[in-house]
């Protein structure tokens, strides 16, 4: 299985891209909204994180902008009734941050808004998402921690990241402060965010 493919983007359609690498053209299915973003990147080199689905007659590649998105896709298609097509539709509708927020809020209506997902499937999917929330949060923190703004303090950057996930500022400040109290002074945002999210989830489970 490929972890990623580095190559030149030579073609884009509404559902696929072609990456040329070492003389081979890889046809890769990807979320439509990422493909739209890539429309200005034709003939440029990029890295695509891939997941391979093996069928009887073919191997199908699915591609994502980050490892976190790829792992989220892997998680989604492990759920009953969710195949690759539906998994892509979910990631095309929601970012990983939004999925985390939806799972916390148990927003079944939001899940049911994804093309191809009815109310009953949405209800089942919500149960699965809630059970896997602890796995989703570190993936989302990994993506958020890759931001590189104009070097605010770790606390400020952590608070901004949690605010982007939908946490109120007061909650974000408390979560970051608690996480930082357990880590060395030189801890990075990439280390702080997973601890903050994990501790908050543990607190919710005690309620």
Swiss-Prot record:
Q: Where is this region: Domain III?
A: 155-207
**Description of how the protein assembles with itself and partners:** Homotetramer. Forms an RuvA(8)-RuvB(12)-Holliday junction (HJ) complex. HJ DNA is sandwiched between 2 RuvA tetramers; dsDNA enters through RuvA and exits via RuvB. An RuvB hexamer assembles on each DNA strand where it exits the tetramer. Each RuvB hexamer is contacted by two RuvA subunits (via domain III) on 2 adjacent RuvB subunits; this complex drives branch migration. In the full resolvosome a probable DNA-RuvA(4)-RuvB(12)-RuvC(2) complex forms which resolves the HJ.
The entry's family comment says: Belongs to the RuvA family.
Q: Does the keyword Zinc-finger apply?
A: no
Q: Which controlled-vocabulary keywords does the entry list?
A: Cytoplasm, DNA damage, DNA recombination, DNA repair, DNA-binding
- How does the entry describe the domains? Has three domains with a flexible linker between the domains II and III and assumes an 'L' shape. Domain III is highly mobile and contacts RuvB.
Q: Which organism is it from?
A: Chlamydia abortus (strain DSM 27085 / S26/3)
The keyword Ligase is annotated on this UniProt entry: no
NCBIfam families, per the entry: ruvA
Bilayer-crossing regions: none
Provide the protein's localization. Answer: Cytoplasm
Question: What gene makes this protein?
Answer: ruvA
Name by which UniProt lists this protein: Holliday junction branch migration complex subunit RuvA
Region (Flexible linker) location = 145-155
| InterPro entries with a match to the protein in the record | DNA_helicase_Holl-junc_RuvA_I, Hlx-hairpin-Hlx_DNA-bd_motif, NA-bd_OB-fold, RuvA, RuvA_2-like, RuvA_C, RuvA_C_sf
Q: Give the start-end ranges of region Domain II.
A: 66-144
Per UniProt, what is one GO molecular function of this protein? four-way junction DNA binding
Name the major location.
cytoplasm
Classification from the root reads: Bacteria, Pseudomonadati, Chlamydiota, Chlamydiia, Chlamydiales
Region: Domain I; residue ranges are: 1-65
Annotated Gene Ontology cellular component terms: cytoplasm; Holliday junction helicase complex; Holliday junction resolvase complex
> What does this protein's UniProt record list under function?
The RuvA-RuvB-RuvC complex processes Holliday junction (HJ) DNA during genetic recombination and DNA repair, while the RuvA-RuvB complex plays an important role in the rescue of blocked DNA replication forks via replication fork reversal (RFR). RuvA specifically binds to HJ cruciform DNA, conferring on it an open structure. The RuvB hexamer acts as an ATP-dependent pump, pulling dsDNA into and through the RuvAB complex. HJ branch migration allows RuvC to scan DNA until it finds its consensus sequence, where it cleaves and resolves the cruciform DNA.
Q: Which Gene Ontology BP terms does the record give?
A: DNA recombination; DNA repair
């Amino acid at each position: 299985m490929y972890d990623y493919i580095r190559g030149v983007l030579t073609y884009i359609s509404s559902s696929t891209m072609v990456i040329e690498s070492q003389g081979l053209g890889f046809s890769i299915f990807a979320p439509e909204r990422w493909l739209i973003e890539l429309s200005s990147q034709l003939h440029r080199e990029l890295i695509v994180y891939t997941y391979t689905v093996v069928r009887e007659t073919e191997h199908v590649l699915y591609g994502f902008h980050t490892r976190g998105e790829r792992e989220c896709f892997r998680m989604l298609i492990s759920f009953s009734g969710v195949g690759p097509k539906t998994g892509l539709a979910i990631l095309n509708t929601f970012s990983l941050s939004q999925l985390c927020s939806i799972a916390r809020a148990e927003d079944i209506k939001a899940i049911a808004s994804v093309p191809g997902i009815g109310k009953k499937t949405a209800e089942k999917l919500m149960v699965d998402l809630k059970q896997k929330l602890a796995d989703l949060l570190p993936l989302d923190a990994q993506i958020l921690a890759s931001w590189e703004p104009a070097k605010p303090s770790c606390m400020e950057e952590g608070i901004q990241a949690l605010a982007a996930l939908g946490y109120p500022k007061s909650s974000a400040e408390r979560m970051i402060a608690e996480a930082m109290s357990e880590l060395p002074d030189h801890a990075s945002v990439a280390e702080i965010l997973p601890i903050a999210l994990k501790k908050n989830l543990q607190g919710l489970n005690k309620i």
